[in-house]
Amino acid sequence: MSKDDCIEFEGTVSETLPNTTFRIKLENGHEVTAHISGRMRKNYIRILTGDRVKIEMTAYDLTKGRIIYRMK
């Protein structure tokens, strides 16, 4: 799947789940589960509850996503 097929959203981490999975509350009110991208995992970027993050999701499954950036 190419990067053009992904939709980006911003949200806040509301809950930490096992295996580096997080529950994200999006700005539009929806809740999705997301995992950390490989580049963030490689660079040891830590994500805590309450952090603002940018996630990308496919148009095919709007319940799961990938965290691609942690806001400062």
UniProtKB/Swiss-Prot annotation:
InterPro entries: NA-bd_OB-fold (IPR012340), RNA-binding_domain_S1_IF1 (IPR006196), S1_domain (IPR003029), TIF_IF1 (IPR004368). The keyword ATP-binding does not apply. Keywords: Cytoplasm, Initiation factor, Protein biosynthesis, RNA-binding, rRNA-binding. GO terms for molecular function: ribosome binding; rRNA binding; translation initiation factor activity. This is Translation initiation factor IF-1. One of its GO terms (cellular component) is cytosol. The gene is infA. Residues 1-72 form the S1-like domain. It is found in: Cytoplasm. It comes from Xylella fastidiosa (strain 9a5c). Component of the 30S ribosomal translation pre-initiation complex which assembles on the 30S ribosome in the order IF-2 and IF-3, IF-1 and N-formylmethionyl-tRNA(fMet); mRNA recruitment can occur at any time during PIC assembly. The lineage of its organism: Bacteria, Pseudomonadati, Pseudomonadota, Gammaproteobacteria, Lysobacterales. Pfam families: eIF-1a (PF01176). One of the essential components for the initiation of protein synthesis. Stabilizes the binding of IF-2 and IF-3 on the 30S subunit to which N-formylmethionyl-tRNA(fMet) subsequently binds. Helps modulate mRNA selection, yielding the 30S pre-initiation complex (PIC). Upon addition of the 50S ribosomal subunit IF-1, IF-2 and IF-3 are released leaving the mature 70S translation initiation complex. Belongs to the IF-1 family.
